[in-house]
Amino acid sequence: MNTTNKESTAELNNTESNNNYNNFAENGNIINLKQLKRKLPEELQAQAEELKIENINSLLKQELVFAILKKSVEQGVLIVGEGVLEVLPDGFGFLRSPEVNYLAGPDDIYISPSQIRRFGLRTGDTVEGQIRAPKAGERYFALLKVNRVNFEDPSKAYHRVHFDNLTPLYPDEKLGLELENNSKDSKDFSTRVIELVAPMGKGQRALIVAPPRTGKTVLLQNIAHAITTNNPEVFLIVLLIDERPEEVTDMQRSVRGEVVSSTFDEPASRHVQLAEMVIKKAKRLVEHKKDVVILVDAITRLARAYNTVVPSSGKVLTGGVDANALQRPKRFFGAARNIENGGSLTIIGTALIETGSRMDEVIFEEFKGTGNSEIVLDRKIADKRIYPAIDITRSGTRKEDLLVDKIILNKMWVLRRIIDPMGSSEAIEFLLKKLENTKTNGEFFEMMKSPERPKNGL
């Protein structure tokens, strides 16, 4: 009887909230929490002054958002919120915001255990719905009605297949990275070189092997720009671990996608928590048959963070790496896969080498065989100020025949045979000169004769 009463009450509440939502929408009295969080602190302060909120100069951005929401609700405004769910051990959860890098804050949205069970929600689900102000004795805004889960109808979330039960396949759909050079002044050929040397597919697990100051961050920015331009259906996440704050700002302003970061002045536990939230969010989206790309800078620093956080096993490898420390970062990187019957998770991460740290070398060696694509950057090329500083002969993709047409693949192999006797610097200089004379790789290949398929592969 009690369960029936609760269900009928819930249905009544949903009907009422729908009617309220429609009424508010007609009057335009709706605040979108996500859009509010994207505002600059100056804009929030101006809005708070209009609402006559006191002591705004002493409030942090999250506290300012909370104060604006509370005041708006008092004035009869409806609030629609969105966030990524983090389920706590007690059974309830909170919607964390990517705008604040999934940090816990006063503007988080509470979700009850009954709502989590009803819709089959898990950590990482992107939930959108109508929220209400905290009642007496409550500290957080609460979710009143679920409108969408992972950008789809909530009913679909309950019947999805768990990520670990999905069947992984080799990448067989190309991820378009080539950007046409429309002007002679354009000097960025990085994505065109990657297309020729190490083509990427949806579900790729790629490592960018990079010594310091070889242009890895700029290369990641170019890849991100190419993905958003050529593959609008892809959900892009850029994950910056242990980075400098100014590089985070630069990435946020240059990339049209979700950029989340944990800077070098934050503890290792924070790096780990952010990485776990990002990978769980990506898995939930893949369960809904979506294509997700995560760009990680850097896998090495993430592994260092896990090494600090993991309980000591008593077995220490060379360089001070705990024997169990690399299991979880490997699980993170290993989540990249192409899924049978739809969906894919692509991870492109940078691995640092030649840093002078023995630990970094050990981490790289552990990750070396786990990827199915490698882009190797060369310090000698970068010292000559030749970018992208890609070592062509050492870079490549496994099973590239699944991604590239046979005729194009044969021409790529011939190109490698021509370049092989050259040194790394001469090879990239030779290729860049040829690319400067053409707008696209298609034009570049038309300049080459159609060869027969090589008998011995590469």
UniProtKB/Swiss-Prot annotation:
GO cellular component: cytosol
Domain Rho RNA-BD: 78-153
Enzyme class label: hydrolase
InterPro entries assigned: AAA+_ATPase (IPR003593), ATPase_F1/V1/A1_a/bsu_nucl-bd (IPR000194), CSD (IPR011129), NA-bd_OB-fold (IPR012340), P-loop_NTPase (IPR027417), Rho-like_N (IPR011112), Rho_factor_ATP-bd (IPR041703), Rho_N_sf (IPR036269)
Annotated Gene3D superfamilies: Nucleic acid-binding proteins, P-loop containing nucleotide triphosphate hydrolases
Composition bias type Low complexity, residue spans: 10-23
UniProt-annotated binding residues for ATP: 201-206, 213-218, 244
EC number: 3.6.4.-
Subunit structure: Homohexamer. The homohexamer assembles into an open ring structure.
Function: Facilitates transcription termination by a mechanism that involves Rho binding to the nascent RNA, activation of Rho's RNA-dependent ATPase activity, and release of the mRNA from the DNA template.
Family to which the UniProt record says this protein belongs: Belongs to the Rho family.
Record-given protein name: Transcription termination factor Rho
Source species: Rickettsia conorii (strain ATCC VR-613 / Malish 7)
Origin organism lineage: Bacteria, Pseudomonadati, Pseudomonadota, Alphaproteobacteria, Rickettsiales
